[in-house]
Amino acid sequence: MIKKTQGTEIRALARHIGMSAQKARRVIDQIRGCSYEQTLMILELMPYRACYPIFKLVYSAAANASHNRGLKEADLFISKAEVNEGVIVKRLKPQARGRSYPIKRPTCHITIVLSERPNFTLKNI
């Protein structure tokens, strides 16, 4: 299902990322509401494995905004960021004496929405 966003919202979606949604949410909660440049700095300095796919997704969304809509990257901020659980990939690990144990690899879907920060000018009354 394709959702159309109104105004100057740019939406980027990464699906089937190989990590649990809980670990990705730990990083997403830190960048929600931040500006584009501040988000990139935060993601480069955080020591979590979830930072790299989120960094790529934010960078891709900003590139789409500048190429498709002609927006400046300096005016963008993260207006919405969410992580949803994906499918669980199931594998079997062989054990001794012909037995096997299941391995469950969780995946997640990450959605980033960038918006243009409104420019307010104060008028002297």
Curated annotation (Swiss-Prot):
<dbReference type="InterPro" id="IPR005727">
    <property type="entry name" value="Ribosomal_uL22_bac/chlpt-type"/>
</dbReference>
<comment type="function">
    <text>This protein binds specifically to 23S rRNA.</text>
</comment>
<comment type="similarity">
    <text>Belongs to the universal ribosomal protein uL22 family.</text>
</comment>
<dbReference type="GO" id="GO:0019843">
    <property type="term" value="F:rRNA binding"/>
</dbReference>
<comment type="function">
    <text>The globular domain of the protein is located near the polypeptide exit tunnel on the outside of the subunit, while an extended beta-hairpin is found that lines the wall of the exit tunnel in the center of the 70S ribosome.</text>
</comment>
<dbReference type="GO" id="GO:0015934">
    <property type="term" value="C:large ribosomal subunit"/>
</dbReference>
<keyword id="KW-0934">Plastid</keyword>
<keyword id="KW-0699">rRNA-binding</keyword>
<keyword id="KW-0694">RNA-binding</keyword>
<dbReference type="InterPro" id="IPR001063">
    <property type="entry name" value="Ribosomal_uL22"/>
</dbReference>
<dbReference type="InterPro" id="IPR036394">
    <property type="entry name" value="Ribosomal_uL22_sf"/>
</dbReference>
<dbReference type="InterPro" id="IPR047867">
    <property type="entry name" value="Ribosomal_uL22_bac/org-type"/>
</dbReference>
<dbReference type="GO" id="GO:0009507">
    <property type="term" value="C:chloroplast"/>
</dbReference>
<keyword id="KW-0687">Ribonucleoprotein</keyword>
<dbReference type="Pfam" id="PF00237">
    <property type="entry name" value="Ribosomal_L22"/>
</dbReference>
<comment type="subunit">
    <text>Part of the 50S ribosomal subunit.</text>
</comment>
<dbReference type="GO" id="GO:0003735">
    <property type="term" value="F:structural constituent of ribosome"/>
</dbReference>
<dbReference type="GO" id="GO:0006412">
    <property type="term" value="P:translation"/>
</dbReference>
<keyword id="KW-0150">Chloroplast</keyword>
<protein>
    <recommendedName>
        <fullName>Large ribosomal subunit protein uL22c</fullName>
    </recommendedName>
</protein>
<keyword id="KW-0689">Ribosomal protein</keyword>
